[in-house]
Amino acid sequence: MSSSGAMPAVSSASSSAAVGILSATTAKTKTKKKHFVQQKVKVFRASDPLISVFMWGVNHSVNELIQVPVPVMLLPDDFKANSKIKVTNHLFNRENLPSHFKFKDYCPQVFRNLRERFGIDDQDFQASLTRSSPYCESEGHDGRFLLSYDKTLVIKEISSEDVADMHNILSHYHQHIVKCHGNTLLPQFLGMYRLSVDNEDSYIMVMRNMFSHRLTVHRKYDLKGSLVSREASDKEKIKELPTLKDMDFLNKSQKVYVDEEQKKNFMEKLKRDVDFLVQLKLMDYSLLLGIHEVFRAEQEEEEDLEEDHTENESSPHMNVGSYGTSPEGIAGYLNSHKPLGPGEFEPIIDVYAIKSSDNAPQKEVYFMGLIDILTHYDAKKKAAHAAKTVKHGAGAEISTVHPDQYGKRFLEFVTNIFA
């Protein structure tokens, strides 16, 4: 399915059904309804040409894959394969798409298979990424972090080294997902792409969002089980939703309140996943923990309704659909079911979510999964270990340890986060 050579964008992009598009906007943490305008043609309008190319590419790639029969089994070559297209775009949608760009889809059959194992339909995947523009959640030193418009997918800018690391573990990762029937706390890797615009390459990884597409996260922790330099900076702490760390977790006497059965299931999954990472000599991963406070969310919802009511009185509404009303996209499944009450979620979409136990001090929902799993214990780590030992002494708790030690310390720390 490799396709290259010049091709006008109009042939792939303009033939699709009516689709809603929205300029990229930065999201507030509150659960405000996002509106998007239904349009006649997929024009991939985003405030950034790179995002437009990404949307065009995913749309093209999924359309191509749909034409190809699903292989009976994946072959070793599928883990090295890629499909690329070079586009010289003269006429179609040139106010949004650059006149020349290239799009590369890495290991398309493997990621298609992973999506299926994670219960994600290809057309829903396509709709979540292209029906409306993704928006930027944050921009850090290691690239941008975007969310699909319906908040079900994370679009992360990665480095070429990450792409190489991903290729190195992909067949092991796939095997692990097959073995555990997709029931994992690891990131759900759903697609990996290269976008080339103006002779510059950008690399993108698409994953399932570990947080909910509808329940706001009020507190967020990145936990590694190390106490050295593991406190959020003052600059971080003043953010609307700061990423807090191990020391903050301990200093706040934070606990996770779930019942014994839930804890047992979670720890079994975590142990299996950590064993897998240790085998591959991977380390420096974190447990991402998001906490949704049910009562606080209800109060915020009431405030939002009052605000909306005032806005509606002052301005006539455009004829738009609100996000979540579309039958397409990963969250579309919810629309055919009964509406969810406060603190309720659909487990097949919010796969990382766990409800607090009945005896918790307050009603909460926790989102917990493993992130940043690609760091290999290599020369770089050994060098960092030497430098830190010199600085802190041989017995100091330091983050850079051997993968076995890292995994053991990590599991011990996570076992103790529960009440």
From Swiss-Prot:
Keywords: ATP-binding, Cytoplasm, Endoplasmic reticulum, Kinase, Lipid metabolism, Nucleotide-binding, Transferase. Residues 299-320 are annotated as: Disordered. InterPro entries: PInositol-4-P-4/5-kinase_C_sf, PInositol-4-P-4/5-kinase_core, PInositol-4-P-5-kinase_N, PInositol-4/5-P-5/4-kinase. Phosphorylated, phosphorylation is induced by EGF. It is found in: Endoplasmic reticulum; Cytoplasm. It comes from the Eukaryota. The keyword Chloroplast does not apply. It catalyses: a 1,2-diacyl-sn-glycero-3-phospho-(1D-myo-inositol-5-phosphate) + ATP = a 1,2-diacyl-sn-glycero-3-phospho-(1D-myo-inositol-4,5-bisphosphate) + ADP + H(+); 1,2-dihexadecanoyl-sn-glycero-3-phospho-(1D-myo-inositol-5-phosphate) + ATP = 1,2-dihexadecanoyl-sn-glycero-3-phospho-(1D-myo-inositol-4,5-bisphosphate) + ADP + H(+); 1,2-dihexadecanoyl-sn-glycero-3-phospho-(1D-myo-inositol-5-phosphate) + GTP = 1,2-dihexadecanoyl-sn-glycero-3-phospho-(1D-myo-inositol-4,5-bisphosphate) + GDP + H(+). One of its GO terms (biological process) is 1-phosphatidyl-1D-myo-inositol 4,5-bisphosphate biosynthetic process. One of its GO terms (molecular function) is 1-phosphatidylinositol-4-phosphate 5-kinase activity. Residues 299-310 have a biased composition (Acidic residues). Its EC number is 2.7.1.149. Residues 46-418 form the PIPK domain. PANTHER family: PHOSPHATIDYLINOSITOL 5-PHOSPHATE 4-KINASE TYPE-2 GAMMA, PHOSPHATIDYLINOSITOL-4-PHOSPHATE 5-KINASE. Phosphatidylinositol 5-phosphate 4-kinase with low enzymatic activity. May be a GTP sensor, has higher GTP-dependent kinase activity than ATP-dependent kinase activity. This is Phosphatidylinositol 5-phosphate 4-kinase type-2 gamma. It comes from Xenopus tropicalis (Western clawed frog). The gene is pip4k2c.
